[in-house]
């Protein structure tokens, strides 16, 4: 059996006459002719306008700031955001600069701290709120009130010992001791006796003093910490640098080397880690953006192999990109975690319009003048590219219907970027080309360059031309399989609840500040870092709130407790104070009598006074607590006690989205017996709301993106049947994408010697979800351009369309995919997952638009030609074409 020669293109039936101005361009030809004349005759004036607008946009864009807080992703009117903001406004100093001093021995460290603290306290109050070098203040207070804080049982024991000894001494002095030996008598009234009784529990437990000498010093005495609390919010980089500069000046003046030549000073605390994290994120976004733009421009250069073309396209997309971020400043004012990496995406998608325009311009330039080539490119590409830009804008715009601020901002910037890049391309790219050709005309393509350009589309053209039925049928079958996988994926709850997979992981590991923070936490304690604050309006609401929360916890089943405990300022007050006061006063009275009667020496008397409360005794109140001990419960205005903390459950991770939702719901809203409602918020509630927003808003955004894109396709093709072909191609690409996501983490294992496939899809988070609606609009680009060029060239073959336009369309996909793949190098795992998801969508829609669609068109041509030949043979009006393609093997 001999091999069959490749089939030739069957003659295409003449395209129906189309008087539509949207397709023929006749109605708009005058407009494009005038525009092209201006662009090619006066390119300098046109580009001067471009330069002026770019400078203005650049000045605005340079003022954009980056906000990394998760609360920036939620709407400003979201209750959790409002409540969290209200709590933060009332919380006292929260930012901490920790000064970490290391040295070979403890005593020089303590002396240096004693010398440094007074100097730090002299710094301006707008920089330094307080300087905490240890627990000296709290220790002094609790030592003076040791009997109040001792367990009632211990106070009763001391009371009984004092009364018994006093009675023993009185009887002994009166001669009524009945010969009792001192060995059997109650212990003498000394300070040592009182101290010993109160310290029995501590000694029995074997607990060591966590703060030797009252300092925050590491066991072994090689590290000591000073906590400098400041009103500067974490993330205020300018004021943080100012504080560091002044603190360094003070440290240099005190000079640690005077105390020990080996002594070193470093910084940590949330003020430093926030600055590091901001810098890491900013640098990461910059690197990802530069890497993405470099890859995009590199692949464009490899397609055209002309520096001039690369520069022209780079300049035109730079105009649109600069406009985009200039308007971003005017409309929004900042970037957030969802929009900070959009530079590469805007460039990767925005350059596609220039690629399509340039491909047609270069093709026309072979036989036409600059003006005619530019006019041809205008007339023949504007509709397809505008439809693609509109579809992309609608896809991004679908995010505006959500309540999620991160989605809205992404939609505004992305959608605006697509349209502004289209405008920038069609306004200024022709002038850039015209000006460059005045200097030196672009030589026609030949040899390697021409073959290289054709090479982009040639593999697709070869497959679609020679195996149309196989490709089309395989595409449909894979689409059906992907659709089934998509249904399974959606029903399996694809939301990412493991929040560790959305955080930032530095490439270099933990910084010195992070390492020191871990060591300092072990010395100082986490000081409520895991708990969340709930704010009440009145102090009398604290107890009812606590009771309501504890009742809610008690009602939860074992193993599903939403939190461990509730903490308020009243936990810092001694218990059984009235009873203890009665016992202390009675004991103090007996000791006083014993001293006056000579039962207690003057030296013991003075020592005992240090352990006995002086003056008139009254219960210790919240205002009596030292500032250091009560700091967590003190508001900015000095009000105490209106803060209640709720501590997460032990053994349940605050990075588990399921638990976060449970925890958040347990204190989000609490109704007190008097009818007042207390709202809670914080990181847990905001995280939970982010997850819930993804679940609620994802279907809405996807539906609107699909509907909007379908309308644009129908409008672009005037509702003709070919629009349905484009829509079907887009649908095929989307199910390919979803099928790919559903297999993201699939595992093939052997079970009993038989292969077993476990399907685990990519989980959707607050960022990668965006890839779904935008892939709808951007993915329509490829099918739109191929079908439009196919209709405009009724005498051309599918193979020629794919080689010429398909090559440019493939390049468009490459630029977009590379922009997305650059995101996978990010240190933020949410951005990485978005990059993969969006790239999967691009590749899927490319395969559908540049391989399956041409294969279908080619197969349809063959079938139509065959039917026409059969019809002619039957009627006898014409002979079968001698070069008609033989049936496929």
Language model segments and positions:
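Signature of alpha-helical transmembrane segments and their immediate interfacial
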Residues: 17-68, 431, 446-495, 824, ...
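Juxtamembrane segments of multi-pass membrane proteins
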Residues: 96, 468-598
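Extracytoplasmic
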Residues: 182-307, 550-553, 609-709
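Alpha-helical transmembrane helix bundles of large polytopic membrane transport and channel proteins
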Residues: 111-224, 239, 243, 260, ...
């Amino acid at each position: 059996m001999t091999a069959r020669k490749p089939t030739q293109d069957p003659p295409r039936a003449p395209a129906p006459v189309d008087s539509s101005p949207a397709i023929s361009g006749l109605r708009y030809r005058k407009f494009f002719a005038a525009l092209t004349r201006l662009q090619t005759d006066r390119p300098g004036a046109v580009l001067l306008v471009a330069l002026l607008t770019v400078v203005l946009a650049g000045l605005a864009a340079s003022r954009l700031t980056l906000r990394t807080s998760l609360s920036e992703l939620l709407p400003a009117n979201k209750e959790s955001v409002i409540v969290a903001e209200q709590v933060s406004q009332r919380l006292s100093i929260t930012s901490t600069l920790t000064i970490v001093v290391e040295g070979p021995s403890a005593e020089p460290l303590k002396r240096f701290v004693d010398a440094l603290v007074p100097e730090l306290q002299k710094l301006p109050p707008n920089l330094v709120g307080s300087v905490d070098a240890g627990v000296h203040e709290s220790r002094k207070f609790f030592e003076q009130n040791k009997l109040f804080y001792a367990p009632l049982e211990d106070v009763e024991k001391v009371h009984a010992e004092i009364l018994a000894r006093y009675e023993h001494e009185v009887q002994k002095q009166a001669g009524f001791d009945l010969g009792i030996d001192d060995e059997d008598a109650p212990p003498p009234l000394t300070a040592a006796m009182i101290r010993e009784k109160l310290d029995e529990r501590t000694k029995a437990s074997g607990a060591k003093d966590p703060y030797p000498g009252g300092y925050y010093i590491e066991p072994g005495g090689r590290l000591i910490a000073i906590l400098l609390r400041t009103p500067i919010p974490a993330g205020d980089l300018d004021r943080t640098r100012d504080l560091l500069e002044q603190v360094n000046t003070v440290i240099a003046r005190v000079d640690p080397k005077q105390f020990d030549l080996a002594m070193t000073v470093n910084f940590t605390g949330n003020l430093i880690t926030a600055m590091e994290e901001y810098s890491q994120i900013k640098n990461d976004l910059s690197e990802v953006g530069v890497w993405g733009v470099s890859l995009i421009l590199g692949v464009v250069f490899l397609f055209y192999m002309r520096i001039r073309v690369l520069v022209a396209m780079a300049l035109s997309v730079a105009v649109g990109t600069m406009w985009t971020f200039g308007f971003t400043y005017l409309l929004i004012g900042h970037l957030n975690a969802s929009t900070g990496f959009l530079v590469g995406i805007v460039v990767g998608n925005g350059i596609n319009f220039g690629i399509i325009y340039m491909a047609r311009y270069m093709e026309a330039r072979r036989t036409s003048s600059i003006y005619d080539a530019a006019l041809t490119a205008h007339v023949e590409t504007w509709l397809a590219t505008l439809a693609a830009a509109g579809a992309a804008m609608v896809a991004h715009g679908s995010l505006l219907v959500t309540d999620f601020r991160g989605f809205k901002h992404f939609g505004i910037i992305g959608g605006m970027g697509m349209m502004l890049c289209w405008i920038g391309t069609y306004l200024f790219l022709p002038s850039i080309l015209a000006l460059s050709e005045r200097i030196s005309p672009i030589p026609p393509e030949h040899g390697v360059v021409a073959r290289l350009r054709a090479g982009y589309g040639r593999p697709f053209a070869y497959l679609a031309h020679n195996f149309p039925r196989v490709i089309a049928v395989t595409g449909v079958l894979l689409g059906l399989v992907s659709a089934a996988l998509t249904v399974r994926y959606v029903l399996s709850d694809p939301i990412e609840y493991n929040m560790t997979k959305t955080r930032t992981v530095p490439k270099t590991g933990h910084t010195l500040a992070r390492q020191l923070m871990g060591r300092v936490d072990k010395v100082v304690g986490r000081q409520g870092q895991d708990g969340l604050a709930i704010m009440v309006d009145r102090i009398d609401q604290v107890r009812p709130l606590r009771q309501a929360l504890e009742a809610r916890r008690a009602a939860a089943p074992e193993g599903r407790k939403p939190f461990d405990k509730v903490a308020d300022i009243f936990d810092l007050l001694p218990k059984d104070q009235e009873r203890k006061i009665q016992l202390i006063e009675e004991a103090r009275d007996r000791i006083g009598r014993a001293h006056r009667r000579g039962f207690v020496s003057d030296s013991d008397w003075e020592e005992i006074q240090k352990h006995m409360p002086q003056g008139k005794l009254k219960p210790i109140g919240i205002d009596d607590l030292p500032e250091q001990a009560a700091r967590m419960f003190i508001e900015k205005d000095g009000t105490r006690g209106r803060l209640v903390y709720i501590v997460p459950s032990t053994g349940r991770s605050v990075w588990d989205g399921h638990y976060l939702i449970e925890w958040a719901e347990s204190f989000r809203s609490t109704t007190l017996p008097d009818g007042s409602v207390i709202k809670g918020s914080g990181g847990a509630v905001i995280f939970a709301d982010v997850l819930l927003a993804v679940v609620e808003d994802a279907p809405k955004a996807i539906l609107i993106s699909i509907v909007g894109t379908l309308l644009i396709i129908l409008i672009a093709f005037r509702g003709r049947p070919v629009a349905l072909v484009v829509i079907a191609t887009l649908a095929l690409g989307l199910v390919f994408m979803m099928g790919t996501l559903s297999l993201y983490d699939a595992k093939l294992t052997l079970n009993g010697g038989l292969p077993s496939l476990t399907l685990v899809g990519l989980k959707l988070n607050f960022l990668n979800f965006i890839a779904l609606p935008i892939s709808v609009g951007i993915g329509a680009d490829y099918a739109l351009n191929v079908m439009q060029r196919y209709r405009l060239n009724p005498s051309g073959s599918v193979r020629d369309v794919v080689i010429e336009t398909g090559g440019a369309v493939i390049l468009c996909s490459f630029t977009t995919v590379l922009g997305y793949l650059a995101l996978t190098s990010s240190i933020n795992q949410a951005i990485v997952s978005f990059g993969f998801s969006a790239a999967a969508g691009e590749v899927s829609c490319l395969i559908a638009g540049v391989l399956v669609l041409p294969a279908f068109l080619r197969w349809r041509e063959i079938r139509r030609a065959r039917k026409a030949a059969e019809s002619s043979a039957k009627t006898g009006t014409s002979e079968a074409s001698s070069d008609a393609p033989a049936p496929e093997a």
